[in-house]
């Protein structure tokens, strides 16, 4: 089964342009499904993937308390896999065509207040004052994620040539291999120049290639390491929610809208394919307005 999963992984990467994060999640979902099938029928193969089995697997996941968003992703993983397997001749028919996608409950994303974002950035800047290469890199990670709102996978995928420091622009390769240009401000530029001048040269090795961000051993930075950096930096801010890079992306979008940015401009900056995804952030700003109103207005 692993050889089939390897071929499916190649399909996701080369033909569908899925990120490393999505591919890992999909393969993990499918391994969970295959383990479920083997528990029911030892030695089960792809022919064991029937609609009742798929429904039973999802029902077991739901009974175990799996979140709706995760169930929706697992359903998507299965539907993508079985459709691919039929096209490859690995399955005679697609059992997932009638498998319904659980409706994910749309919840407001956790975001930082502007003062909390400022405190997190100040903490990252303070840690970089001694010139330690990793501290300079960590400062750049936090500054650039908040300044641009790009995804952590997009940040870690940047090469040096993707950065126009003088014009303060990033050339970002997003989902579906769609390229967009994203601006950043002076604080992020300062963090970038410090990293390129003093941080990156100290970590670079023959294996670094053109990668902008590097790990401690000189290789391209893994998004999981960047997530750890963000969690630790934001976690040091009193009262701040526990967020990672995606939370900084949410925060950047929310603060742009609070500052009066046009919704379609924010959509372009974030690389959303539809405006509906970006509109979720308008609910965050409305929720904040209502909270302030309820607290401050005498007739609330």
UniProtKB/Swiss-Prot annotation:
Which family does the UniProt entry place this protein in?
Answer: Belongs to the 'phage' integrase family. XerC subfamily.
Keyword terms of this UniProt record: Cell cycle, Cell division, Chromosome partition, Cytoplasm, DNA integration, DNA recombination, DNA-binding
Could you identify this protein by its name? Tyrosine recombinase XerC
Q: Tell me the compartments it is located in.
A: Cytoplasm
Q: Which Pfam families match?
A: Phage_int_SAM_1, Phage_integrase
Q: How does it assemble?
A: Forms a cyclic heterotetrameric complex composed of two molecules of XerC and two molecules of XerD.
Its cellular-component GO annotations read: cytoplasm
Q: What does this protein do?
A: Site-specific tyrosine recombinase, which acts by catalyzing the cutting and rejoining of the recombining DNA molecules. The XerC-XerD complex is essential to convert dimers of the bacterial chromosome into monomers to permit their segregation at cell division. It also contributes to the segregational stability of plasmids.
Catalytic-site annotation from UniProt: 151, 175, 246, 249, 272, 281 (o-(3'-phospho-dna)-tyrosine intermediate)
Gene Ontology biological process: cell division; chromosome segregation; DNA transposition
**Sorted alphabetically, which Gene3D superfamilies does this protein's record hold?**
1.10.150.130, Intergrase catalytic core
């Amino acid at each position: 089964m692993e050889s089939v999963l390897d071929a499916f992984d190649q399909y996701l990467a080369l033909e569908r342009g899925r990120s490393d994060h999505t591919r890992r999640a999909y393969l993990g979902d499918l391994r969970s499904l295959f383990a479920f099938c083997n528990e029911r029928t030892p030695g089960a193969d792809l022919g064991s993937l029937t609609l009742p089995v798929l429904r039973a697997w999802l029902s077991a996941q739901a009974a175990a308390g799996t979140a709706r968003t995760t169930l929706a992703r697992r359903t998507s993983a299965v539907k993508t896999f079985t459709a691919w397997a039929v096209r490859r001749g690995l399955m005679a028919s697609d059992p997932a065509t009638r498998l319904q996608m659980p409706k994910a409950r749309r919840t407001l994303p956790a975001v930082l207040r502007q003062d909390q974002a400022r405190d997190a950035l100040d903490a990252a800047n303070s840690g970089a004052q001694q010139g330690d290469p990793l501290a300079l890199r960590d400062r750049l990670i936090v500054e650039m994620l908040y300044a641009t709102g790009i995804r952590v996978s997009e940040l870690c995928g940047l090469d040096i040539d993707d950065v126009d420091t003088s014009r303060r622009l990033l050339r970002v390769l997003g989902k579906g291999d769609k390229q967009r240009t994203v601006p950043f401000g002076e604080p992020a530029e300062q963090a970038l120049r410090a990293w390129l001048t003093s941080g990156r040269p100290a970590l670079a090795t023959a294996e670094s290639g053109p990668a902008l961000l590097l790990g401690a051993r000189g290789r391209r930075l893994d998004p999981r390491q960047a997530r750890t950096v963000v969690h630790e930096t934001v976690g040091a801010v009193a009262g701040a929610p526990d967020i990672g890079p995606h939370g900084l992306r949410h925060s950047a979008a929310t603060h742009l809208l609070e500052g009066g940015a046009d919704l379609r401009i924010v959509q372009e900056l974030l690389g959303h394919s539809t405006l509906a995804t970006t509109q979720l952030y308008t609910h965050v700003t409305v929720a904040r307005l209502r909270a302030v109103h309820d607290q401050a207005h005498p007739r609330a």
